[in-house]
Amino acid sequence: GKEYEQDLSLGDVKYHLGYESEVETDHGKKVRLSLMPNPSHLETVGALVQGMVRSRIDSQYNGDYNRVAPIVIHGDAAIAAQGIVYEVIQMSQLAGYKTGGTIHLVINNQVGFTTNYLDARSSTYSTDVAKVTRSPVFHVNGDDVEAIIFTVKLAMEFRQKFHADVFIDILCYRKYGHNEGDEPRFTQPLLYKAIEKHPNPRDIYADKLAAQGTLTKAETTNLNHEFDLFLEGKYKESEKIDKVKVRRFLKGEYLDYKNPSKIDLIQPVKTGVKKVELLRIAERINTLPADKKFFKKIDRIVEDRRMMILDNRMDWAMAELLAYGTLLEEGFQVRLSGQDTERGTFAHRHASFVVEDTDEKYFPLKNISETQGQFHVFNSHLSEYGVLGFEYGYSLTNPRSLTIWEAQFGDFFNVAQVIFDQYISSAYEKWGMMNSLVLYLPHGYEGQGPEHSSARIERFLNLTADNNMQVVVPTTPANMFHLVRRQLHWNVRIPLIIFTPKSLLRHPMVTSSVDELSNGHFQEIIEDVVSKPEKIRKLVFTYGKLYYDLHKRQAEEGIQDVTIVRVEQLFPLPIDQIKSIIAKYQHVEKIIWAQDEPSNMGAWQHVQRFLPTVPFELISRPASASPAGGLMYQHNLRLKMILDSVFEEKVLA
């Protein structure tokens, strides 16, 4: 293939590139058509299409489902076998995800690469998944051109009237192999003998038109010849092109944003909010309507939050809610979804309150002011793959929206691994497609076992390159506040992966003052205050919850010759800041990298990659195939060994 005209690092094969255009209908109306870029991981793009459409419905069309429609083209083998199809179809009537119905076009060529359809599904039809939502299915002969056109029009009318999914099963065949180099006669010799003898749909339709007296054979032959000449002319033109120009998908939406350099991602961004404004918004979201009755514990939660403001000691949830509230007041849109997200897995957020003895919900963040931006929060169905794909698509179309997907526990992110690998980490490098999706992945070693401890930080760090995303482990409410606000207040749009806390949500040390939210910005590094740097003999770098365990041991034992540095941003790693801190401590005997995770996990190998000359000594749990142990006493023993190794001259076994 030819080189790209733009500075895309790698690009992609032509089959995967997206496209946009505006066409004029026979009635003179202009319609915008968008073809999503998509990988060879079949059916993944369907979730993104749903998210894109819902985003436009929310932000551009004021909830009108008739202004935009999703169309998803499937293969018969894929729609019958890929689990994400079921996840996405289950969304179709859910309040947080419905798009007014999808047109599903199934190109049923009765073979999946080399697999016969009898080996590809147990159901009679490839479209039997439509029974889940009782959607109509039209089975159409692929040789009957007019029947296909009629069915597509009928399906669209049905969709517009009933706002439900419609399936069109086009029974047809694949004339050649799976790709240019494939020989189908190896595996389907009988089928391809039949296909060889079968007239193509164009000739069948030409014969029909001739029989009707609509067009003569000579006229259709002439039309075919004219079209062949047109194609040949375009081919000749393409030969003169030296470099391919990849038309950037959604270019218009991202004109104000740039592909970031490393400098862009470590420059301070002003994210503070005036104190009076913070207090006003806090008052609004901590006030329940007097005409509604709430569960007593809800009243207590709200009262506790009011006291936080008065005591000037805000916890994680309060800072998080204020981040959303301030963005909403600035006119941005905020959308947050995931399993149990309204309340929060750990009952910390309470973004909605249920009115007692009813199903009515009250959303404080929807009631800040009449001029605020839209706030959406939804509990998703029990899906990671489909929902993450949806939220990625949602965030694509509106760079002024803070779109967040939260995992119930960070451990479950890998159910959606395809979305991370094929889209979140690589879409810009392949397709020039920007995105600012935020992910909340609860992470922390607290003795809850291998399924509820690790969001596998190492996996995300392994995907980092070319400033493609941010990987962050904030440890203070203020830093979380500034981090969330930064995502919309700088002129770049890249994904943000946040490893959020669990036990720290209510930790007495994990609080921030109103001034810390009002002033300052996100801190990539947080240093402990040291009055006499010359006395320090151990310099400990760490991140996440382990900092508070280290701090507690240090305070209990009155240790003065050790200082602890929190690395809040793991990518882009603040290399210059780390080196500058090391240079300050002239008498240090040991530079330690301490982490809760096993040595083959966490950030250790990532740090070695970017700081190979720094003589770090690793203190962590031993290398392990499983991310965490399942016994509390074992967990506590390992933690004690880490702390002992940091503060005493002991070797971690």
Which residues fall in each region the model found?
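Conserved internal helical-beta-strand scaffold that buttresses enzyme catalytic cores
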Residues: 1-71, 77-84, 89-102, 108-118, ...
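Thiamine diphosphate
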Residues: 99-217, 221-225, 433-434, 445-456, ...
